[in-house]
Amino acid sequence: MINSHHTSQQTLNKESKSQMDKSYNIDDSIVDAKFENYTKKYQDDKLNKILHTYIKNPQILMDEEKEIKERFLAKQMKDVAATKQKFDTKNKLQQLELENENSQNNSYKTSNNLSKEEVIAVLQKQNRKSQVNSVLADNSNIQNDFYPQYRKPKNPTTKKRQSTDYTKRNTFQLENLNIQQQLNNKDSLNQQNQQQQDLAKNRVDNSQNQDIQARLYERTELQKLRIKQKEEEQAALKNKRQTNRSQSIEQNVNFVQNDNQKLIDRHKEYLKQLKQQVTIEKETQKQLKKKDEENKIRLRNSVLASIKNDLTEQRKLIQENHNLFLSKSTVSQSAKQISLPEINQSLTICLEKQKSEVEQEKKAVLTSQAFFRQSSLREIEETNEKIESKTNLSKVKKLRPLPFISSMVEWKKKQRIPADSKIFIVMGGYKDFKKALLKRGWIENPQTNSPCFDLKWTLLGKDIDYDNILPNQIVNHFENNSKICSKIGLLNSLKNLYWFDNADLNCFFPQCFDMNDPDEFNDFVKNFKLSKAVSVLKKYLRLYLEKDEKYNNCKIQAQVALQVLTRYYNDINNVIDDEKQASEYFKSIPDDEWEILASDEMSNEDLAKKKHFEWIKKIKLAYQGIKVKAQVKKKKKKSLAMIKKMISNEAIKRKQDGEKQQIDSSDSEDEEVEMDDFTSAVNQFLNQREKCDPQFNLKGEDNIWIVKPAGLSRGRGITCYKNLVEIIDHAKSMELQMIVQKYIENPVLIKQRKFDIRIWVLVTDWNPLAIWYFDECYVRFSADSYSTKNLSNKFQHLTNNAISKKKAQQGQDEITLQGNMYTQEQLENFFIETEGYNVFQQKIKPQIINIIKWSILSCSDTVESRKNSMELFGYDIMIDTNFNPWLLEVNTSPSLEYSTEITKKLVKQVLEDVAKVVVDYGMAQKSGIKKSELQKIGTGKFIKIYQGLEIQDKGINSIQKNFICEGSKMKIRKPKKQKKNTKLDKKQNLQQDLTINNQINHDQKQFSSQQANNIETYSRPQTAKSQTQSSKKL
């Protein structure tokens, strides 16, 4: 029993040791696999929460990976220590068990020599109850046999039998004891051999465990060393970066200085080259002048010699055959009449023409030289700007993006910025505005979506979150600004101008209609027909005065037009009484009359044919690959023979022109006197309408209207038409919201080109309203010369820079060299040369300022006023031949690009002056400085043209000013003194009062019953009878 238990314990110990060996045989691959699984689980848990931060900030991810590795290593070390402790405890237990087993074997070996009581004590110590009981049972039998005193008394008859049995039993027991002793000795020998084998195995296992522990210890130490090495490497990298930063700053400074020196040297060399070129050009000009003078003298001499030879030959022929020559040839007669002074005049004319041509060529050369010099100066300025930008960037501190911080105080602490510093955000370019703010010590926030800013300048109003803006943050857009910036919003807001000022909309804004509104569409059709009638009358009168035979063809058309216009513009008070006349008045133009007026216009069939032929042309051009190009005209040189003919022809024509002028002057006098009754009526009507209608001069002979999409800019989708059918068809075909506006047919032209004026306006507040006018504008020209024959050519009718820059121009003049633009000074000089005084400053500019005020006042109720908001607007204005300005549109976020040299200078100045107004003047005004000190602060070229009063409760369409009452004085006589009333008079008065009260009560009851009936009729659907009855009642 004891041996079996011992063997079972040994087997259990071996299994536990094998399991421990397997658990401690750890490789590097197992550790790496566990580490990867652990990191994957850790990342999967937190990936959705912190993914956007890890993408933007990879440094955070690296730091967290380091922390994860350190935690994993710490846990691994703890596990190793715990396994060590478990292993040590198990080893101790095994040693104790082995000692106990050895002690047991020793006890069994000495059991033959020991007494029975000692054997029992040993067994009791080892807690072997089952063995103890078996031994006690054997001993009880022995005691009964060997010790009779403990035995019970028995019968005498059985004594003999017991004695024999006793002897037999003793012999058998002794034999058994000997056998047991021999077996026990064999078992003890076997146990000793097994114990020695087990001890040898334990020693081997202990040595293996010690090797595993040493490996683990070495591995942990190696990991610690790696961590230390990484930390040391990171510290070394930090030190290197700090040293590299200091070195890079010094290198940048040295690099900038070297660049500056190189650029200065290049500029010096370039200036030397320019000086040499200028000297060479002067010498060449002198030589050319000398050659020109010599050529002129040679031409004069040659021409005079040839003329003298011709005259001498002609005189000889005249003297020989005087009569025959006069009868046959008329050329000789004309040559005879030519005298020497006339020849000299013709020569001077030819020489002047040559001079003009030479001067034009010189001007072209000088303009090209000036352009070359300007381009060189431009390059110098750009290089200087680059150097300044590099130096500024080296000084400016680069900030980190912090997307999850909303408070300004925390953001400044994280960026390590002082609390007093001002922060701005700029979106969409605007480099000059950035420079202006950086000069003033502001700091740029690179994160455009951040709520941490003091000023934000954006291209679009969508980029501003109006719901979450703080009241002290400055923004460059107003909410709901479409009431002034969109074409439909401007139209609707200008209709309410009479609530704010005594100004007529028709004096500065051409007629405009919304094609999507049915009422306005009908008004447009009516106004188109009326303006067509006016154009017919103008055309008829012009043809009649020019004595063109075509005026008889359009006389019927003019008679109908005059009839229509006189009926329409007749006083409505004379027409309203007669129902027939009233219906004709409101109908304005019947269909029969319109057919006569629109006889020269396009019908629906003609429009379909036109579209068909246009598609066929497009298909042919696409198939053949033909491209239409503008033909370049080349100048041809004139020979001496051509000059001679021109001289003789000009001398002959002068006499003929003088005779014709005398005849024409006599005829014109007769025309003024002799005029038909119809034409005189037309003339009188047109003169009356010119006085009454402020837009009379805009209506020309062609009746052109311009169609615009309401939401597009830069000339996109704009077309011009003069046929009603085409306008309606175009408006229906477009899915966008369209607007129709009267085309200005009498614009001022400069060198046969149409132009408009771009003006910048700044609004800093709506309550109280503050308007700033930038006192320098620029002019934008069309790319081609103006004509109304081809309305599809956008280069003739549109002045947007986005369109004109696409035109490939062949020749160059002052306008094209400047990018189809003029400065304000050039415009003023043009008016001084043509009109003799500065028309822009004296007449046009005051009207433009009034237009700006009226347009902004008209929408002051609809635009949401917010403190610390401002906006820059771009006004487009055109001028007619009477020097009246007309408002075309108002733009938000006007283009501030360097499209030309003119815009480059002005854009820089505008953005710098905006910073002066908003930052310098605005911040000083908020601080509560006196007005005298505020006036000293410079605002550049921005002038305040309007400062309104603050309104606490602004109502919709509130009356602002100019409520006028008119009338005449009245004489009121004093009432006569009445006599005292008697008793009868009092009774009569009481009766009258009672009757009046009864009538009032009766009327009130009737009124309440009528209201109840009306409510029932509105609530129920009316039948045909009830509708007729209600109409009769009304």
From Swiss-Prot:
<dbReference type="InterPro" id="IPR004344">
    <property type="entry name" value="TTL/TTLL_fam"/>
</dbReference>
<feature type="binding site">
    <location>
        <position position="756"/>
    </location>
    <ligand>
        <name>ATP</name>
    </ligand>
</feature>
<feature type="compositionally biased region" description="Low complexity">
    <location>
        <begin position="189"/>
        <end position="199"/>
    </location>
</feature>
<dbReference type="GO" id="GO:0005737">
    <property type="term" value="C:cytoplasm"/>
</dbReference>
<dbReference type="Pfam" id="PF03133">
    <property type="entry name" value="TTL"/>
</dbReference>
<feature type="region of interest" description="Disordered">
    <location>
        <begin position="1"/>
        <end position="21"/>
    </location>
</feature>
<keyword id="KW-0067">ATP-binding</keyword>
<keyword id="KW-0436">Ligase</keyword>
<dbReference type="GO" id="GO:0070735">
    <property type="term" value="F:protein-glycine ligase activity"/>
</dbReference>
<feature type="compositionally biased region" description="Polar residues">
    <location>
        <begin position="1"/>
        <end position="13"/>
    </location>
</feature>
<comment type="function">
    <text>Probable glycylase which modifies tubulin, generating side chains of glycine on the gamma-carboxyl groups of specific glutamate residues within the C-terminal tail of tubulin.</text>
</comment>
<feature type="binding site">
    <location>
        <begin position="741"/>
        <end position="744"/>
    </location>
    <ligand>
        <name>ATP</name>
    </ligand>
</feature>
<dbReference type="GO" id="GO:0005524">
    <property type="term" value="F:ATP binding"/>
</dbReference>
<feature type="compositionally biased region" description="Polar residues">
    <location>
        <begin position="131"/>
        <end position="146"/>
    </location>
</feature>
<feature type="compositionally biased region" description="Basic residues">
    <location>
        <begin position="151"/>
        <end position="161"/>
    </location>
</feature>
<dbReference type="GO" id="GO:0018094">
    <property type="term" value="P:protein polyglycylation"/>
</dbReference>
<dbReference type="GO" id="GO:0070736">
    <property type="term" value="F:protein-glycine ligase activity, initiating"/>
</dbReference>
<keyword id="KW-0547">Nucleotide-binding</keyword>
<protein>
    <recommendedName>
        <fullName>Tubulin glycylase 3D</fullName>
        <ecNumber>6.3.2.-</ecNumber>
    </recommendedName>
</protein>
<feature type="region of interest" description="Disordered">
    <location>
        <begin position="1002"/>
        <end position="1034"/>
    </location>
</feature>
<feature type="domain" description="TTL">
    <location>
        <begin position="571"/>
        <end position="930"/>
    </location>
</feature>
<feature type="region of interest" description="Disordered">
    <location>
        <begin position="131"/>
        <end position="166"/>
    </location>
</feature>
<feature type="region of interest" description="Disordered">
    <location>
        <begin position="189"/>
        <end position="208"/>
    </location>
</feature>
<dbReference type="InterPro" id="IPR051437">
    <property type="entry name" value="TTLL_monoglycylase"/>
</dbReference>
<feature type="binding site">
    <location>
        <position position="754"/>
    </location>
    <ligand>
        <name>ATP</name>
    </ligand>
</feature>
<keyword id="KW-0963">Cytoplasm</keyword>
<dbReference type="GO" id="GO:0015630">
    <property type="term" value="C:microtubule cytoskeleton"/>
</dbReference>
